[in-house]
Every structure is written in structure tokens, then in C-alpha cells.
Amino acid sequence: MCTGKCAKFIGVSLYPLAVAAIICNILLFFPAWDTKYVLEDNKGGNKTITEEVKYMGGLVGGGIMVLIPAIHIHATGKQGCCANRCGMFLSIAFAAVGVVGSLYSLVVASLGLVNGPTCLFEDSEKQLTWGTPFMSNKEFGNDSYLFDPNSWNKCKQPENVVEFNVILFSILLVLGILETLLCAFQMINGLFGCLCGTCGKKGRQA
């Protein structure tokens, strides 16, 4: 497969991944499928939305910073069997931006999983308060809340917020890994296309 077809395949593959990352990040603002938590965030000193959600890892990092490079990479691959040297060179830079964005999304998703959601829970004094009850354990160890579903009922509100966050942040984590791999591969593909030139239908170099 020549470099142009590879670029086209990578560009097309990145589109749904970027869109999915944007959707996941937007959904995270509405735990329990309710708008009141995002509207009440920071009112009265209470944070009702998980901090990692507000970092916009999926929206900006895995979304916009991957979607824009995907458009260029896809366009580069449309020019015959493979793109021209200049286009392939530029695709390396765009793919690098995609790597940075997807890594940012990956890191934020990891933090979101490790720290756990912001929710209403009972503190040590049996008072209901907004906070992050699972944040004390910051490692994916056996004691992590991720491996202890029975502890998820610590969160009183939003309803089922732990499951909600775990599912969406896990999806963002997987999307970030796939985007990073595809963008990194395009950097290598673009380098070959830039150095070796373009190929036409009959395998001729331009």
C-alpha cells in the first residue's frame, strides 16, 4: 500500500474517533443525564462537576486537535495514489499535533479514572458534602475504587455517577490510545512519502 492510500485510511479512521471523543466529553458534563449539576457548579463554593471533565481532554485534545489534522491527512491521501512531497511533509506536522492532542486526552482520561468523580457523599463527620471521595487512592491498585464496585454507593448524587464516569473516561482512554497510534503512524508514513516521493497509478515516482 502506497503512502497516499495509508494517509487516506488514517484520515478516515480518525474522523469517528475524534467525533466520539467530543461526544464523550460533552456527555460527562451531564451526569445522571441532568443539566442541573453543570448549572450549579461552583455555586455556593460547591463543585458539582468532576474537575477532569473541565480540562476538556476529549473535546479539545482528542477532538479538535485530532479532527483538524485528520482533515489535512485525509486530503493529502486523496491526491492520486499518494500525495505530493509537500503535502506529506505537512502531514507530519499535523500528525504531531494530533499526537499531542490525543496524549492530552489520554492523560486527562487516566486522571479522571484514578481520581474518581465529584459527587455528594458523607464525610468523616457524617455530613453530606460535595467532593471527590475516591481521590485518596490515586493508583490502579487492588484497593482502588475501580475494583471495588461495592464502594461506589458512597456517591449519593448524581445518581450512578461512578458508573457514568468510569464508562465515558474508559472510552476516552481507548480513543486516546487509538488516536495516538494512528497519528504516530502517519508521522512515519508522511516521512516515507516525503523522502521517497509520490507514486502514481503505475507506480511511477513524480
Cite the ranges covered by each PLM segment.
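Individual transmembrane alpha-helix segments
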Residues: N150-I177
